[in-house]
Structure formats: C-alpha cells, structure tokens
C-alpha cells in the first residue's frame, strides 16, 4: 500500500511538542506501508496571497495543491494522511479529484486554540475563522478522523457534528537509559525543578504564573528549557534569582537526567501535552494542573501531584523536595504500559486495513 503523508512539521529542525507527535505518526506508518513525505513549507509569494481567497489556511498555497495533485497523479496513492486539521482545503481537493481515502489527524482542536489567541491579539481572529473553516472541511471530507483523547473527540463532535473514528494518544519512542542518571550530581547540587516546552502563549503564561505565585516559596531552582524561550530569558530571570532560562537545546536528555522533578503549570489548551509523556518516559515525578494531565490515564498523586493553585504547588513540591526521588518507577511503568510507541502501532495497522478496503 502506498500513502502520501502531508505535514507542516520539519523533522530535521529543533524538536518540539508538535513535531514529536507528527514524527511519531510518520515513523509508525512508514514501518507498516510505503509512505511518501510531503512537507508543506511556508512560502511568501503571490501564491500565498491568492490562496487566502480560496480559504486555505495561511501557509497553504495553490502551489502546494498543484504539487500534491501531481504526486497523486504520478503515484496513485491508496490513502492521503493529513497530519493536521488545518488541511481542510487539501482534504476537499483530494476527495473531489482522486479515488483514494483521506485520513486526518487532529493534534488538537485548532479553532479553539486560535479563538483563545484572538482574545489577546485581534489579528488572530482571522486565523480563527480560517481554522474553523478548515476543520469543518476536514470533518466533511475525511474518511477517517483521529483525535488524541475523548475531550477532543467530544469537542469536535459538538462543533462539527462528526465524531472521530479513532483515539490515538500521545506516545514516544522509548529513549531512556536508566544508567545515565547522574546520581552524584543530584546529591551534591541544589535540587532543580524542570519546565519543558516551546515558547508559545499557554506555556509562557503558565510558567510566568508559576514564577510569580509559587517559585518564591519553593526550596529549589527552576530551569526552563524549550525552543524559543531564550527570547524572554532576561525578562523572566529578572523575576526571581532562582530561575535559569536555557531556551533552545539540541538534546533534552541531560536536563531531565539532572532534574529532581518536572513542573507543568498549563491552564489553557486542547489535545494532550506531549511533554507529559516525555517526562513519564524519563521516570520523572510531575507536578501539573488539570490541563497538563488531560487525556492521560494516570493516578496524579502517584505521578507527583495535581496542583491548580500556587498554594497547592508550594505544598506538594516542598514536601517532595524534603527527600526528592529522582526516578519515579510508577511513572516509568505507566509510560511503558500506555504511552510508548509500541502501544499504538496496532491502531495504525487497523487504520491501514480500513483504508485498503
């Protein structure tokens, strides 16, 4: 079976949450079928502006449509896997012109995300309308829709009157080697709390809230690691002298290894938080909000703690830091049982069987 996989993610750049989920999809499909990758690169030219007239989401152009059209003519794909719900225009074009199945993966409910942004940036209101239109097209023309969790499944059904056929949660390729844990460094240094996430609004607002409302009363240093956070390094570090902003890194592993625990003060969003699965993979204790744990089948107290206020973060984390355990065997077990790539491979196999009929 031959499949065309369409994505906006660059798998060769600095990894982030979005690219990790997309790369997982591509890798597992490639193990099961003959998959061609089509990378939608953002272009600023006449095609980009003309595409807005046709209600393609910004960044998707008529030129992209033409290139996908040519690939479909040449290769005669059995299915097109659209790795974002913002590809509604592509879904519509494919279904009207070619006799092949269309699968759409909703990494979250994008219209909800842009609606949230539009409250703080009027220009994002336009993006919200394009996202709404694109997701409506996806739900109309896709043969199969995949969501991360039941919350997104329910939200999409409410908004577009279409329920997703499959649930595939966030998972990771297991890269953890327990022997690499630097126990000597952990015993000698002041405990480090780790926040991991790329620089976008919910992450920025969440970690800034934590710095202002919890960190002053917690007996540890905070490190912030994630693509783009170096942009606000001096702004954030000025808020507390127990804070170090690292920003973009090529490898996240050393930071997880040396951290006593992970904090996830996320209050807005949809989908599942990719960095939660990553923290579980490394066997790290996690203190997070309800939003951070959303979609994960886990005992929050065994994982670390469910904290939604500054006081809850301070109490739970200071108690943990009295005798920090750098390796949480429960979290590691949950990862192996539910959030390792091998646990969802059978679902992709089932999807491929369905699109081949």
What do the predicted segments below correspond to?
Residues 136, 140-179:
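Donor nucleotide-sugar binding/catalytic pocket of nucleotide-sugar-dependent glycosyltransferases
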Residues 275-281, 285-289:
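Short hydrophobic beta-strand element within catalytic cores of glycosyltransferases
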